Amino acid sequence: MKDQDLELEKVRLISLATKLGFDEDSAKKCLDRFVDLYGDDGRDFITVELCGDDFLAALADFEEGTEEWDDIQAIESEAQGNLAEMFDKSTNPSDNGFDTDDDDDDSRVEVHVIEDSPEPKKKPEIVELDSSSDLEDVETRFKVPRRSQTCSRSMDYSMEDSVSTISGRKPSVQISNKDHETPSYEELQALDDLEFANLVIFGNKVFRPLQHQACRASMERKDCFVLMPTGGGKSLCYQLPATLKAGVTIVISPLLSLIQDQIVALNLKFGIPATFLNSQQTSSQAAAVLQELRRDNPSCKLLYVTPEKIAGSSSFLETLRCLDRKGLLAGFVVDEAHCVSQWGHDFRPDYRELGCLKQNFPRVPVMALTATATESVCQDVLKSLRIPRAPVLKMSFDRINLKYEVIVKTKEPLKQLQELLRDRFKDQSGIVYCLSKSECVDVAKFLNEKCKVKTVYYHAGVPAKQRVDVQRKWQTGEVRIVCATIAFGMGIDKADVRFVIHNTLSKAVESYYQESGRAGRDGLQAQCICLYQKKDFSRVVCMLRNGQGRNMDRFKSAMAQAKKMQQYCELKTECRRQMLLEYFGESFDRMICKSSLNPCDNCERS
């Protein structure tokens, strides 16, 4: 490459860096080092097309150290400790809250969870029945133990009716939606089996969209892929069938913190026995669970495992074969299924190996679930899990009650945030997402001290007890606003969140959709706002470089996703709702947004 051509390419690379928000002087210094590293023999490779991502990675490394990025590994380590403590307490006979069918067998291990939250224990929601005859009807249709009885016994429910296709369900019976109104005997009689079980076990009077179809597919031992937006009720799609079918349902989940939340809810709120296995357990803890699974009548209905347990444990696979031979392997559930795809925003290599489930157990149904998957990710997941012809149950990604908006940051962004909260969200509950731990703390401090707005902050570096207290204060309304990193969101389900503000753009459209989707779960109007300035993107690049472990392929993939998020923020006239939906492969007419009650900012202006 000639000198003049090299200078032209250097100008292009500097332009690329500044366009993405990097400081020009820093970019020039880094580029000089970059050129020296390539040397004379590598000059031909110094182009935007051939080394643009490498240059951005080097620039991110050059600027590293100015911010502390969040890492959920700290939360994962704490979750492992909590789970281990729960397990140890549950295997202590003096603490054991379960009865057993084999009282004379001292070797039997019953697994349940002891609550580790400072919150007062809530009483389970009980479906009240009109009379003793109604109760007899419940017990006739399902052998459901009352909530005061043991939950360790195997609950083998039969389905009276079966439909040939997933979509061929009858319309839901309309039951009064008043929270405290007892269903009448006639209403109970009119329910189909799944509706009846949903009411009796989980206290839900109606199914949300697609839940019934997903549950029916599971009961008929059919594979399926469920795509539901955040707050759509994915967990019920496998938890309800798991309680009705004989045997154990295996749930693969990527994070121990998610597993902890699920097990606590199942055991304490619904009285459904669930336990877990992961690679961090002691050998004696793992052996106790495996021993229980090999019994003729395992006590647990759901077993949560991390993906490496499936791919890397021959003893666990042999235990699954033992269950299968006895007809007690009820099904596999792959939660957060987008982690399977190398094109997804949260790819995990261990998830890629889960195709072995269908390979080893071809007759056992697989249910995959996710809240965020593009069309290409969806196809990759189906292929990788070896269920290419599985029906895809997909809800619309359009959250019609959410209003999307991007606001360009001013020279005083904190003051701008203060005015936004004061003028538009006074006395309302919301989340302010921040990119780093330091940003999270600084924003919360500003709102508390300068604005006199009661605010708490949440990131993985906050001690566990303090995080629990922060979540409790926000959930109960004692504090309206929480400033948080990506660590906040797992297990969060607060209905009346009126706004989600991203103080810095998210790292990917999938992440933004999921985080902003925590607003308006009560169906009422809520606003999703991103505060944007070009130089913030350089911080996203640094975060991605830090989080990808210097793996260039993963960094390049993450960069491509981040650039899509930047494009969303820089839309001048195009419909933001349309871009979000089309990103997930859903066609959308912009006129619908324009004429809706919650048009995006661009449609509102046009």
From Swiss-Prot:
Residues 153-167 have a biased composition (Polar residues). It is found in: Nucleus. Induction: By cold. Repressed by drought. Residues 413-563 form the Helicase C-terminal domain. It holds the Pfam family DEAD. Residues 87-106, 115-134, 153-178 are annotated as: Disordered. One of its GO terms (cellular component) is nucleus. Disulfide bonds: none annotated. One of its GO terms (biological process) is cellular response to cold. Its cofactor is Mg(2+); Mn(2+). SUPFAM superfamilies: P-loop containing nucleoside triphosphate hydrolases (SSF52540). Its main location: nucleus. 3'-5' DNA helicase that may play a role in the repair of DNA. Belongs to the helicase family. RecQ subfamily. NCBIfam families: recQ_fam (TIGR00614). This is ATP-dependent DNA helicase Q-like 1. It comes from Arabidopsis thaliana. The gene is RECQL1.
